[in-house]
Amino acid sequence: MTQAASSQRAVYWGTGRRKTAVARVRLVPGTGKLIINDRPGDQYLQYQEALLASVKAPLELLGLENSYDILVRAHGGGVHGQADAIKLGVARALCEVDPANRGPLKTEGYLKRDPRAVERKKYGLRKARKAPQYSKR
């Protein structure tokens, strides 16, 4: 494949994770469509404007919201966790598009993986930290 042909069919990949959600994000030059698991993004995110804005935030920061189509395969977790995973995947894919994008994305915190996850339940306890009532006598 020649250099010109490869630049026209440029596809940029990014993987994002949050809690138990994993999103494999593909950025393709286009008009700004969002497709998640073969469904329109607004439908998949249950028409929640905050989640839709969160997913597109890295693109809007760089002024590229109408330059790339976002194609996503997401699994695990719930809608909120998947939205955060998609946001991280989009930011990582934008770093592949142009390494100069890394600076602004990093200062806004879009390249940080949120490490918080559910703490496991321990035996002898009711929940992760809740102990049964203690009676001295």
From Swiss-Prot:
Taxon lineage: Bacteria, Bacillati, Cyanobacteriota, Cyanophyceae, Synechococcales
Compositionally biased region (Basic residues): 123-137
One cellular component term from this protein's GO annotations in UniProt: small ribosomal subunit
Stored SUPFAM superfamilies: Ribosomal protein S5 domain 2-like
Stretch list, region Disordered: 105-137
Chain intervals with Basic and acidic residues compositional bias: 109-122
Keywords from the named record: Ribonucleoprotein, Ribosomal protein
Taxonomic source organism: Synechococcus sp. (strain JA-3-3Ab) (Cyanobacteria bacterium Yellowstone A-Prime)
Pfam families: Ribosomal_S9
Molecular function GO labels: RNA binding; structural constituent of ribosome
Protein name: Small ribosomal subunit protein uS9
NCBIfam families: PRK00132.1 (NF001099)
GO biological process per UniProt: translation
Family of the protein in this entry: Belongs to the universal ribosomal protein uS9 family.
UniProt xrefs under InterPro entries: Ribosomal_Su5_D2-typ_SF, Ribosomal_uS9, Ribosomal_uS9_bac/plastid, Ribosomal_uS9_CS, Ribsml_uS5_D2-typ_fold_subgr
